[in-house]
């Protein structure tokens, strides 16, 4: 994670985190991937998130789907650190791992996603980050509504999702196949595209362009993989519930969605009256 020290200027404080961050599951397979292209893409994603954090004020931050806690650890040791940062994940195993690795970091807390239903969390957060999560959610609308409830008045939602349309999807599928052959990450299980599906994905606009596979876990819950995800469709859903502020692209902003690998959507919670009118 040396990139973080260089780009965000945390200096000596960052060195304390190096071992804790490096040992994280997602850090190992993403920012420290054996594939230089994959590592570059994800390092750029984290750097973009930290840069955007400078535009998002607030004392209490939630990272929904925090994974191994890498982003929160970098955020809490950067120039835009909130007073309290909460990471939420699905399983007790992930939460326990994060708590153990970052037990010496003040202001960082890790909880189960189900814990967010408690009254203490309603309206409690000035900013919510949801990175590389919503593309996997079969029905994002209820989750977006939950974010609105968790945010304080005027709070900010920062979303990042993969770009799986246009030229990027073709390049990504090639990279995933090569990574799969090399035994890197989860890429051996990448869902394939037919020729027609790939053409529709390359030419996709603002409506859903192909059917998305629904995968069922052993516990009966369902999720999507990346196939067929359209960030423009999600942007419309976000805009129905929040005021869209701006968008960005990573790993390099000037690439735009035509060539970038992730799209960022920054939105602000609407006033109660405006939200009620929109729902009606």
PLM feature spans:
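Flexible, glycine-/basic-rich loop-and-beta segments that form/coincide
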Residues: 273-280
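Conserved SAM-binding loop
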Residues: 46-169, 238, 264-270
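N-terminal auxiliary segments of SAM/dcSAM-dependent transferases
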Residues: 9-11
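S-adenosyl-L-methionine-dependent methyltransferase catalytic module, highlighting the catalytic core
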Residues: 15-44, 93, 114-117, 138-152, ...
């Amino acid at each position: 994670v040396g990139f973080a020290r260089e780009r965000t200027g945390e200096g000596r404080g960052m060195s304390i985190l190096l071992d804790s961050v490096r040992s994280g599951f997602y850090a190992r397979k993403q920012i420290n991937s054996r594939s230089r292209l994959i590592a570059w893409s994800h390092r750029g994603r984290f750097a973009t998130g930290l840069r955007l954090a400078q535009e998002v004020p607030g004392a209490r931050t939630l990272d929904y789907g925090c994974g191994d806690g890498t982003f929160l650890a970098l955020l809490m040791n950067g120039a835009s650190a909130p007073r309290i940062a909460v990471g939420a994940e699905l399983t007790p195993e992930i939460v326990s791992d994060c708590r153990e690795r970052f037990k010496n970091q003040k202001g960082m807390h890790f909880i189960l996603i189900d814990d967010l239903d408690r009254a203490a969390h309603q309206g409690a957060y000035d900013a919510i980050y949801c990175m590389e999560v919503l593309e996997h959610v079969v029905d994002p609308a209820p989750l977006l509504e939950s974010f609105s409830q968790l945010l304080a008045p005027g709070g900010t939602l920062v979303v990042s999702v993969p770009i799986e349309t246009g030229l990027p999807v073709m390049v990504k599928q090639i990279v995933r196949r090569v990574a799969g052959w090399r035994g890197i990450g989860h890429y051996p299980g990448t869902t394939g595209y037919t020729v027609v599906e790939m053409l529709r994905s390359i030419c996709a606009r603002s409506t859903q362009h192909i059917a998305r596979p629904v995968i069922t876990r052993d516990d009966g819950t369902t999720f999507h993989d990346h196939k067929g995800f359209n960030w423009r469709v999600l942007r419309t859903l976000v805009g129905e519930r929040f005021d869209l502020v701006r968008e960005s692209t990573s790993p390099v902003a000037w690439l735009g969605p035509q060539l970038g690998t992730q799209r960022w959507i920054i939105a602000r919670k609407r006033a109660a009256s405006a939200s009620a009118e929109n729902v009606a």
